[in-house]
């Protein structure tokens, strides 16, 4: 079997294992087994369930980490798909299935590429190449990758997210900010007896909307966006 066909079948096998966030064990075991078959020097599953494989060169040098996540967004509308979301079917040169581009295709390609590079060079390269298959990215991005970074201690990182084959040199980063306003509950017929937390939150939101995000000459303008508002416990508090 040639390398391309072997990679295609590897990707299809990964797609056929559903792996919503928190349920990545099956595909993690597949990644571990494939790395071992490909001759990675060390393959471990960390305390969060992410897989880390190491391929060492013959000479000392720096460490590069190729990273991707193996969880996928859950499927709640399978009946609306034109192909089985977990079938890994090929149609007109494309593989269809949940997680194909985000990002089982990339992860399987990176594992295969490292293995073939080691084989073609006879491992005559400096340093170490690591491949990580992280979990919980779709719902809790950053936590599992922090553990991988601690274990691999890379000098350079390449993240295999889909970019239409264009190289992206960085990203703007992300921060999630939680703002709370407190009120005093009362019956709506006697609003003067309480404090409406929602009104306080409205004032906070208006102030936030006046903030102008920073702009970077390469990364562009920053984004500041309200993503959620909750009253909990209702109606005593509002959380954004």
Description of each model-found segment:
Residues 13, 112-119, 203-209:
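Short glycine/serine- and small hydrophobic-enriched flexible loop segments
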Residues 62-130:
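Active-site metal-coordination/substrate-binding segment of hydrolases
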